[in-house]
Design a protein with these regions (language model features):
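Rossmann-like NAD(P) dinucleotide-binding subdomain of oxidoreductase/dehydrogenase enzymes
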Residues: 93-170
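N-terminal Rossmann-like NAD(P)+-binding subdomain of aldehyde/semialdehyde dehydrogenases
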Residues: 1-101
Length: 170
């Protein structure tokens, strides 16, 4: 992907984030459910790619990569409402007439660059957290695990609009 294409992608994601579409909690939950279903659907392809890139068995691929990601998504779906809830915190004495609170809010566009050794886990697990937080994301899987990078690209393309989540390979 050329520099100009990446710049355009980044701008589209910023525009999408600023539209407020990712702030809706039901939107985030729906995105996480789609990702969970897609991972389950393509689990055999993911394991085959991990075998090709790293020589991992199906058992190791599940225990160290896909199983952990599916578990993270399940955990996030269970707790997302409490993680995104506004929280009252103690007010400093100087502002006694005020109310203090902490409100979790997304950053915007998140870049997730992953290493070669756990290419699926270390790409998708941070994505789960970015989606749950209400961000858009650009994923850059390692060039040293090309088969897994391609499966991730196909999986993300199937689940999400590029203005929401995109994959840059190479």
């Amino acid at each position: 992907m050329e520099k100009e294409q990446i710049t355009q992608l980044l701008e589209k994601q910023r525009q999408y984030f600023y539209s407020g579409a990712t702030l809706n909690l039901d939107f985030r939950i729906s995105a996480l459910k789609r990702l969970h279903a897609s991972i389950q659907k393509h689990e055999a392809q993911i394991h085959a790619a991990l075998r090709k890139d790293l020589g991992k068995s199906n058992f190791e691929s599940y225990m160290c990569e896909t199983g952990l990601v599916l578990s993270e998504i399940t955990h996030m779906l269970k707790h997302i409402r409490s993680y995104t809830k506004e929280e009252t915190v103690p007010t400093p004495l100087a502002q006694f007439h005020s109310r203090s609170f902490r409100k979790p809010s997304p950053y915007g566009v998140v870049l997730i660059m992953s290493p070669w050794n756990y290419p699926f886990l270390l790409t998708i697990e941070p994505l789960v957290d970015a989606i749950a937080a209400g961000n858009t994301a650009i994923l850059k899987p390692s060039a040293y695990s090309p088969a897994t990078s391609e499966v991730i690209r196909l999986l993300i393309h199937e689940c999400f609009d590029p203005k929401y989540v995109s994959v840059v390979t190479g």
